[in-house]
Amino acid sequence: MLHGVTLFLPSIVAGMGEWTNAQAQLLTTPPYVLAFIATIAVGRSSDHFFERGFHMVGCDIISILGFLLLVLVPREKVAVHYFAACLVVVGVYANVPAKVAWFTNNFGGLTRRAIASATIVSVGLVGGIFGGQIYYDGPEYKNGNTIACACAAAQLTAVLILRFKLGRENKRRAQLSEHEKELELLRYGGLQLIGDRHPDYRYVL
């Protein structure tokens, strides 16, 4: 989503009215200013409450609403489309800090965290390949926005499922006896290898 929106926002904005390319580029500035403010706000709130999942869900809902407006509202309603573009950029970009913090928080041990971070970021960057291919049906880009909306909805669903599973695992660990904790340590190779699988480790939700 992030790559597709970044690459094609000027084209999407240009398709809303009779603007030159330079004007369309300038009109992309306010959405990014709003996204900057939202990104800082979401990051601070996420750290303050030490919570990631619901912050990501909130951002996904905002971006989904924006994509739906772009798909369903006629292109002639320029103000609505521009508002929708702002929602999309805010939702997609403000999602990033909570997302990055979430997976780094939940991998214990330097090696596991380093490998996981590199792998997840690399997989995320593959999105740049697909992001440049989905916006092929200008000037309305209904197919591209529909695909991006589906991706946002899929991410929202995945976040809710993962948050539920991590919460359930935290509860399971809280109920372990000392003997069961010792067995878990042995199962994963002792303190040097266990990382976030340690029975006293609690996943960030």
Segments predicted by a language model, with ranges:
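Cytoplasmic membrane-interface "Motif A"-like loop-to-helix N-cap segments
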Residues: 47-61, 111
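Helix-loop junctions at membrane interfaces in 12-TM secondary transporters
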Residues: 71-85, 95, 165-166
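A late C-terminal transmembrane helix in Major Facilitator Superfamily
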Residues: 107-141, 145-151
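Small-residue-rich packing faces within the transmembrane alpha-helices of Major Facilitator Superfamily
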Residues: 36, 64-65, 125, 129, ...
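C-terminal ends and interior cores of transmembrane alpha-helices
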Residues: 58-76
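Extracytoplasmic gate region of multi-pass secondary transporters
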Residues: 1-46, 53-54, 96-101, 127-132
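Intracellular juxtamembrane helix-capping segments at the cytosolic ends
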Residues: 92-109
